[in-house]
UniProtKB/Swiss-Prot annotation:
Pathway: Secondary metabolite biosynthesis. It is found in: Membrane. The lineage of its organism: Eukaryota, Fungi, Dikarya, Ascomycota, Pezizomycotina. Its main location: membrane. Its cofactor is heme. It comes from Botryotinia fuckeliana (Noble rot fungus). Belongs to the cytochrome P450 family. The keyword Repeat does not apply. Cytochrome P450 monooxygenase; part of the gene cluster that mediates the biosynthesis of botrydial. Botrydial is necessary for colonization of plant tissue by the T4 strain. It is a strain-dependent virulence factor since highly aggressive strains like SAS56 or B05 still retain substantial virulence when botrydial synthesis is impaired, since they produce also botcinic acid. The first step of botrydial biosynthesis is performed by the sesquiterpene synthase BOT2 which catalyzes the cyclization of farnesyl diphosphate (FPP) to presilphiperfolan-8-beta-ol (PSP). This is Cytochrome P450 monooxygenase BOT3. It holds the Pfam family p450. InterPro entries: Cyt_P450, Cyt_P450_E_grp-I, Cyt_P450_sf, Cytochrome_P450_monoxygenase. Its EC number is 1.-.-.-. Gene3D superfamilies: Cytochrome P450.
Length: 567
């Protein structure tokens, strides 16, 4: 390095040494360097300063490369040491270390990501394999357990009088519904929020608005009657998503969405629902992604990750409805609390924090999503399996004949229809075959839970699968078959224990009564005597059977939609 420097005269060398010494002194905080003051003012000093800087820079480059390499090595070493210690702790020292399961699941969450995202919705299937290998309780992540034992269901999903039940915080992160009643973490907050919603969703509350549900069901029938004899082919799930979307829109906000009015039954609504559900596992694995996407302008999000826009659009729909309701309440001279769920909430004396846009937007999103997709999927199963078997269709139509004698002047009521055993069997079989696949994790915040010889520590998330309950071969003969008659007459009462489409306990589905009402009314209308004749157009059972787990169950990739021809 010295050879590359220009030749220095004696004065310059002296000044250079002076500069270096002065710098060293100043570096150590010595401000009084009197012998060097005159040198600083000299021309030689200025030249030396320039040369010294070049020498220092050259030395710094050498030091920089060395130090960067050293720092990088140390950082990597510390990181790998941290990972090693973390994995060691999770495998051998963690409170859940005694529970069986794949070692990779105990060590990290990446296997769940791999099964959900890379393998395409196979996490539920992988949990099933773990249970087959290790038994009724397995560790599915560093923090979470899964149980397969129907007798334990009522001990896990308990009422508030038995034990407090919290939501697992990590299980709700990233989906944008955090402020909804369903995903409220603490038992107390969930109970408070749900209490204000229950009057609208009680049996009495749904009976009071049953005429609104019936009006939408009759509108669907009018659309089908208009196509009678035309040979038109329609997408069943588009039509049924439009129906359930119109119903939940009316119940939640009193708004007339008009999804059934669209000639194609508003396929964009069904696509929005599917995308919002299918993206949930990604947000569960990486909660920050949704928060980041929500901060982007719509145009940028649409180009970066088009699927991510679904949650944004769903949230905007809910927010617009809530803002309209606030305006209606502010300008109306009469009490609007009985119009819809959000009219009721915004007119009540709940704390103002519970009336915020962010809070109610989350509530609206989950009501629209669950209220649309769950009911539509179940009705699609009813349509497919009834039409697939002429004997089932014939028996169902015959049972409906007496209650539809007065139609269209008199529509059969929910109370009348639920008494029909074969219709009830058809609805229950559709619910059974269409159960949620993913585990619904619950935490006991204050008490350990005993499961056989295992003691599950308090605050540990434990989940069970509705789908596994519904396909238990020890309870349901031919569990994959659609057999309405299995629910008629004398039958194995363990079927009632295992039948949990709306789960149980203090966090059971809020909309259970709404779901029953629309399932009975819509199923009966689709197969009423004198109605349009529906014929399956193409596809088979493999196009509807659940093969993928995105929280809700989905058919195989590339499956055809259920389509019917109207004769």
């Amino acid at each position: 390095m010295e050879k590359s420097n220009p030749t220095l005269d004696l004065a310059t060398k002296t000044a250079l040494l002076t500069w270096q010494k002065s710098n060293a002194l100043l570096q150590h905080g010595i401000e009084r360097a009197t012998p060097f003051v005159l040198a600083v003012k000299s021309k030689a000093w200025q030249d030396a300063q320039s040369i010294g800087s070049k020498v220092a820079e050259a030395k710094f480059r050498d030091i920089d490369r060395t130090e960067i390499t050293t720092i990088t090595s140390v950082a990597l070493g510390l990181y790998f040491a941290y990972v090693f210690c973390l994995v060691f702790y999770r495998l051998y020292l963690h409170p859940l270390a005694k529970f069986p399961g794949y070692r990779i699941c105990a060590a990290c969450e990446w296997y769940e990501f791999y099964c959900y995202i890379v393998k395409g919705g196979q996490w539920g299937n992988e949990i099933r394999k773990m249970h087959e290998k290790y038994g009724p309780i397995v560790r599915t992540s560093p923090w979470e357990l899964s149980v397969r034992d129907p007798a334990f269901y009522d001990q896990l999903y308990v009422t508030a009088s038995t034990r407090k039940t919290d939501m697992w915080p990590r299980g709700r992160e990233g989906n944008g519904f955090d402020n909804s009643h369903h995903l409220s973490v603490s038992h107390e907050l969930h109970r408070t929020r749900r209490k204000h919603l229950e009057p609208f969703f009680s049996r009495q509350g749904i009976t009071r608005i049953e005429s609104r549900i019936a009006e939408r069901v009759m509108k669907m029938d009018d659309r089908l009657v208009g196509l009678k004899g035309s040979g038109s082919i329609i997408e069943v799930d588009h039509m049924l998503c439009a129906l359930t979307g119109d119903i939940i829109g009316q119940v939640s906000s009193g708004m007339e969405a008009g999804l059934l009015d669209d000639p194609e039954f508003t396929p964009a609504w069904k696509d929005l629902m599917i995308k919002s559900t299918a993206i949930a596992p990604l947000f569960r694995c990486f909660p920050w992604i949704n928060k980041f996407l929500q901060s982007l302008p719509t145009s940028i999000m649409n180009s970066v990750y088009p699927k991510g826009i679904s949650n944004m659009m769903l949230g905007k729909t809910g927010q617009q409805n809530i803002e309209k309701i606030k305006t209606q309440i502010a300008t109306s001279k009469r009490d609007l609390s009985d119009v819809s769920v959000f009219h009721h909430l915004l007119s009540s004396n709940v704390p103002e924090s519970e009336k915020s846009i962010d809070r109610l937007r989350a509530e609206s999103m989950i009501l629209l999503l669950a209220g649309t997709l769950a009911g539509a999927h179940t009705l699609t199963f009813v349509v497919f399996y009834v039409l697939q078997n002429p004997q089932i269709e014939k028996r169902l139509r015959a049972e409906l004949q007496p209650v539809f004698k007065g139609y269209p002047n008199k529509m059969p009521t929910w109370a009348e229809l639920e008494k029909l055993p074969y219709l009830r069997g058809c609805v229950k079989e559709a619910l059974r075959l269409n159960g949620l696949v993913g585990n619904l994790a619950r935490c006991s915040p204050d008490e350990d839970i005993q499961f056989h010889q295992w003691v599950i520590p308090k605050k540990t998330p434990v989940g069970m699968s509705i789908y596994a309950m519904h396909f238990d071969q020890n309870v349901f003969s031919e569990p994959e078959a659609f057999k309405p008659e299995r629910w008629i007459g004398e039958y194995n009462k363990q079927m009632d224990r295992n039948f949990v489409p709306f789960t149980k306990g203090s966090r059971s589905c809020l909309g259970v009564n709404l779901a029953w009402a629309e399932l009975y009314l819509a199923s009966a209308m689709l197969f009423r005597p004198g109605g349009p004749k529906l014929v399956l157009h193409d596809g088979g059972e493999s196009d509807i059977k659940i093969a993928r787990d995105y929280i809700m169950g989905f058919p195989k990739a590339g499956a055809k939609d259920v389509r019917v021809k109207i004769e």
